[in-house]
């Protein structure tokens, strides 16, 4: 049995035993608090960071399968891989601040911090209290320093302006109609789309040369007139990178990585970069995509 399997079954056994009438997810959150130092060091001293990360992902998948709640889906690691490569092209190994405004389980930031060679100052924002607790626990086990903010990311945030804001942007509707009125991209009537408000909020917290790297449903880009006006007057849409077709069951679920910046920025070319990422299994095609992206960057 591999170390990964040993760790998974060790934690899974305890979580199942402690679950009682509650959910596996709640039991996992409680167990990973590891208030007993002996339990904590038993994991940290005997298992690699990679095994801890993978075990967490498998445990989380089991927990989310039981909950059967689409809003609790996690960002696939391959998407984080694409974004980590984009950030390496943009920043090489510079120290930069990176915030995720819809961090959920923390999986996006976990993968980014382990896949990338960059030196990142990380901030995680999520409204869900259980997810915030879960993140605190797993980042503690991974010995990764992350500022975790448990609040609605669409409310005012007490953070500095960021070099990079990433998010796998939620697509549903935002329930707080009063707060949505603070946004230019709020709907003229009824509930506003989360995705549009997240794009605007990301722009609000970017520094002058910061870059928003957001995963959005592609149909968001084909929506309301106020979004087109916002693009003309308030931000730049610098790149639309469509994810591989094979990742989605049908065209309506298609997602893209978009890069946004503030007006008057000098980090990215103003000419929009349009591309579709080849499957990561197509090594030659993927290498060509990265080369095209680097060539585009050199045009600024």
Q: Predicted regions span which residues?
A:
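A short N-terminal interaction module
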Residues: 1-63
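Class I SAM-dependent methyltransferase Rossmann-like catalytic core
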Residues: 65-77
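Conserved S-adenosyl-L-methionine
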Residues: 76-167, 172, 218
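A short acidic, often aromatic-flanked loop/helix-cap motif at beta-alpha or helix-coil junctions
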Residues: 155-156, 246-250, 280-283
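Mobile active-site "lid"/loop adjacent to the S-adenosyl-L-methionine
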Residues: 169-198
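Conserved nucleotide-binding/hydrolysis micro-motifs of P-loop NTPases
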Residues: 171-173, 219-221, 247, 263-265
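Conserved Class I SAM-dependent methyltransferase catalytic core
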Residues: 191-246, 253
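Flexible, glycine-/basic-rich loop-and-beta segments that form/coincide
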Residues: 252-300
């Amino acid at each position: 049995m591999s170390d990964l399997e040993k760790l998974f079954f060790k934690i899974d056994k305890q979580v199942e035993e402690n679950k009682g009438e509650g959910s596996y997810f709640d039991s996992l959150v409680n167990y990973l608090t590891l208030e007993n130092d002996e339990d904590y060091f038993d994991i940290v001293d005997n298992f690699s960071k990679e095994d801890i990360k993978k075990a967490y992902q498998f445990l989380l998948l089991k927990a989310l399968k039981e909950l059967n709640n689409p809003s609790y889906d996690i960002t696939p690691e391959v998407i984080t891989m694409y974004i980590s490569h984009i950030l390496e092209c943009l920043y090489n190994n510079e120290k930069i601040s990176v915030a995720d405004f819809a961090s959920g389980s923390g999986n996006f930031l976990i993968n980014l911090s382990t896949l990338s060679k960059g030196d990142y100052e990380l901030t995680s924002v999520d409204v869900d209290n259980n997810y915030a607790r879960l993140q605190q626990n797993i980042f503690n086990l991974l010995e990764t320093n992350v500022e975790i903010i448990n609040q609605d990311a669409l409310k005012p945030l007490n953070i500095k302006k960021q070099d990079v804001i990433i998010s796998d942007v939620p697509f549903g509707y935002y329930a707080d109609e009063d707060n949505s009125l603070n946004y230019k991209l709020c709907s003229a009537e009824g509930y506003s789309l989360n995705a549009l408000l997240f794009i605007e909020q990301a722009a609000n917290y970017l520094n002058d040369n910061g870059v928003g790297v957001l995963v959005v449903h592609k149909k968001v880009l084909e929506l309301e007139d106020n979004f087109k006006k916002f693009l003309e007057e308030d931000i730049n849409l610098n790149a639309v990178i469509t994810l591989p077709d094979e990742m989605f069951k049908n065209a309506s679920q298609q997602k893209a990585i978009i890069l946004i910046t503030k007006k008057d920025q000098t980090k990215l070319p103003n000419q929009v970069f349009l591309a579709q990422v080849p499957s990561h299994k197509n090594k030659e095609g993927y290498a060509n995509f990265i080369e095209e992206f680097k060539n585009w960057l050199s045009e600024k």
